[in-house]
Each structure stands twice: as structure tokens, then as C-alpha cells.
């Protein structure tokens, strides 16, 4: 990594910390709104906005331009809400008025079976609450994540995630050879797996997705077959007033 890139990463992270500091006098509701609107504005200027439009047209061919724009704008705003909520993730999880849980009876059934499972979800709403929630409900869980190129942000996000865990039995591991080893060891030691499975991958099995050839990871399916693990979907949505 060049010195220029390292300095750029440091400045990006420093700018983020300054923005969070400047938002301190405002309420969490107002701060979250400011960050989300900023994300939407900046997102529209990025190359990813056009990529999102093209993808939406493939997935939702019957929607008009206005409807597609609304979906994308909401997505950018959700990312902004997520980033801000990450700054107080531990407190967010303790706020019973902010998070509504449905399907606890399913978790109780899994507990009674006393056998590890694979929880899977996608990057929707605030996906960061999933692993700490499982951990708080006595599910020892290992989660795989993709590291961020900016190591200052990567270290910060990792700390926020681990600080939100109630026990030392759950863990986060970066995608790669190390994570494969740690996840397998976790399963052998009766720990569950949590995965977000909606990201495009440069490696893996080629599948047909909305008429397009894409690659996706299927390693977790091989683990599920080998160890006879159940696959448990988790749905996470953002409600009005940023409740989850």
C-alpha cells in the first residue's frame, strides 16, 4: 500500500470522525436523517448509482424510472442510517423500543434441538444487529465478513461489532482461508454460522441470476451437507421512525 493511499484513508476516517463530532449536539433522530440524506446525495453522484439503476431494471422490468429512483434513494439512505447506527450499536441493541423481534418461537425450537445451524440473511435494514442479537439470545455464533480496504474504517467497524457482543463465545472473522478454518472449528465446537449471502463474488460457483451469469459462494452449503446443519433465514426490515 502506497503512502498516498494510507494518507487518503486516514483523511477519510478523520473526516468521518469530525462529522460525527459535529452531530453530537443534535438528537440521534436528526443526526441519522442528516447522514442518510447526505449518503443519498453523494450516492447519486457515484458510478454505483447507475449500476443500481441497471440492476433494478433487470429485476423490476415493469417499474418506471420514478419508482426505480425511489428504490435506489431509499437504499442510499438506509446505508446512511446504518453507518450512523454503527456508532452506537451496543446502545441500539439495548433499546427495546427500537428493535421488534418476530419468530422467537423458531429460536426456542432451535435451542431445544441443541445443534448448530446456519443463519443467513442479506444486506437489508441494519444487518449489523443480527449477530449481536443471536449472541444475546445464547446462540454462540461465528460470522464471516468482508474487510474494508480502508483499514482505519475496518478496524473501527470491527471494534463496534465486537463491543456489541454480550459474550466471548461469538466472533467475527474476515473472509478468506482463516475464516474457513475458524468457521469449521466453530461448527465442530457447536457454534452457529451467520452469513450475508447477497454480494457479488469474483470466485465461486457460476449460477443463472435473473438471466445473468454470476458467481456466488456455495462453501456454506457444503458445510451444511457435511455436518447436516439446518439453514435458517433471517429477515431484517427498517420500520417507520427507524425502528428495526
Language-model features, listed with the residues they occupy:
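Membrane-anchoring hydrophobic helices of lipid-metabolizing enzymes
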Residues: 1-121, 126, 156-160
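Soluble catalytic domains of membrane acyltransferases
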Residues: 90-244
Amino acid at each position: 500500500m502506497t503512502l498516498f493511499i494510507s494518507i487518503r484513508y486516514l483523511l477519510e476516517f478523520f473526516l468521518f470522525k469530525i462529522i460525527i463530532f459535529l452531530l453530537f449536539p443534535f438528537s440521534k433522530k436528526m443526526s441519522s436523517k442528516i447522514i442518510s440524506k447526505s449518503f443519498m446525495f453523494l450516492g447519486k453522484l457515484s458510478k454505483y448509482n447507475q449500476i443500481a439503476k441497471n440492476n433494478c431494471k433487470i429485476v423490476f422490468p415493469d417499474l418506471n424510472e420514478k419508482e426505480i429512483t425511489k428504490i435506489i434513494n431509499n437504499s442510499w439512505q438506509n446505508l446512511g442510517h446504518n453507518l450512523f447506527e454503527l456508532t452506537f450499536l451496543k446502545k441500539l441493541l439495548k433499546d427495546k423500543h427500537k428493535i421488534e423481534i418476530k419468530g422467537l418461537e423458531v429460536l426456542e425450537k432451535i435451542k431445544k434441538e441443541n445443534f448448530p445451524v446456519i443463519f443467513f440473511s442479506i444486506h437489508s435494514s441494519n444487518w449489523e444487529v443480527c449477530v449481536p442479537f443471536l449472541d444475546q439470545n445464547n446462540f454462540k455464533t461465528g460470522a464471516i465478513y468482508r474487510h474494508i480496504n480502508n483499514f482505519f474504517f475496518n478496524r473501527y467497524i470491527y471494534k463496534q461489532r465486537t463491543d456489541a457482543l454480550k459474550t466471548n463465545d461469538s466472533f467475527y472473522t474476515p473472509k478468506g482461508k482463516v475464516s474457513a478454518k475458524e468457521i469449521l472449528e466453530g461448527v465442530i465446537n457447536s457454534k452457529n454460522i451467520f452469513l450475508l449471502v447477497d454480494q457479488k463474488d469474483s470466485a465461486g460457483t457460476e449460477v443463472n441470476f435473473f438471466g445473468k451469469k454470476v458467481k456466488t459462494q456455495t462453501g456454506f452449503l457444503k458445510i451444511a451437507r457435511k455436518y447436516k446443519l439446518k439453514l435458517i433465514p433471517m429477515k431484517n426490515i427498517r420500520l417507520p421512525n427507524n425502528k428495526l
